[in-house]
């Protein structure tokens, strides 16, 4: 399930216009079969035969795409694909694995590739999740800490640089007995390379302290970690009920290949309550913390597409970030008797409110970032 959000935060109003072209397998209304005698088998229409063929197919895929504009990257030509399938096609009780992928081409030069797969194996005894990305884009650096971030001037000469980087971050989850508890290891390998820093960015104190120069900055990180997860969600990719609670820790150290030694600790709590057909109330509390000799690009971010919408990506960064948020989601329920109603059945909306907190340590809060907005949801499967 993919959705597009248009958000308005209390610090800044950002208008995003995203015309999307949706290519999806058609959904057809049930038609009455041709009249038949008592000793004959009713004939199926071409639409019904196609519907049965699609239902039997293991791999389902959908594509979204089109031009857009974002405050971070300007004009963008983007596309998203969603693939779902069962590892064992003959086991209809098995959870469908989900592989979303996104690609964006920046008209000012650059590309962004991202995937966050969820793979479910036999009996849901074993899962492989992860994050995989490649970016080559123009980005901005606003220093470290709320007091610096909120007043830092964004411009070509003060904050802009060219970023190129890759991340490979799989995690492996094993179910403990017959419980909803999973545990397992994770690996995180990432490389960040900053070039073409702005004229005055090279004099920014935290940039210089980290080792940044007029030629840029680069860092390689290799980490090992663990996860302990409780997951009772009905459908992990788009839950309507249940709870998700995730504890994870990472160690990046020189003896396993990292340029610097530092640690990451994250807690992610989410709860879902069904309020009726295709209506759900969801709320979350998250904390992300880093400790040690933290690289310039590995600080905890507050205000990203994955928590508080509407802020510039990467503007607010420090060693600790905390977010609380609640949102109401609803899809339009139609009888799907016409093609218009079938299309409307894929449309919904979301309204949310929340707040972010950031500081140099988990217990010291220096900045508060309020957030609220409304958005559009599009169901592609």
Name what the model sees in each region:
Residues 47-59, 87-96, 122-127, 177-180, ...:
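Short loop/turn motifs that connect adjacent beta-strands in outer-membrane beta-barrel proteins
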Residues 53-63, 68-216, 314-315:
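Gram-negative/organellar outer-membrane beta-barrel architecture
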Residues 59-61, 73-77, 95-97, 109-113, ...:
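Residues that define the transmembrane beta-barrel architecture of outer-membrane proteins
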Residues 60-69, 94-107, 113, 243-255, ...:
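Transmembrane beta-strand segments that form the barrel wall of outer-membrane beta-barrel proteins
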Residues 61-63, 97-101, 126-132, 181-185, ...:
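Transmembrane beta-strands of outer-membrane beta-barrel proteins
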Residues 77-89, 113-128, 226-227, 264-274, ...:
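Feature captures outer-membrane beta-barrel proteins of Gram-negative bacteria and organelles
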Residues 84-88, 102-108, 135-139, 190-194, ...:
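Sequence/structural signature of outer-membrane beta-barrel proteins
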Residues 224, 229, 233-343:
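C-terminal outer-membrane beta-barrel translocator/porin domains of Gram-negative envelope proteins
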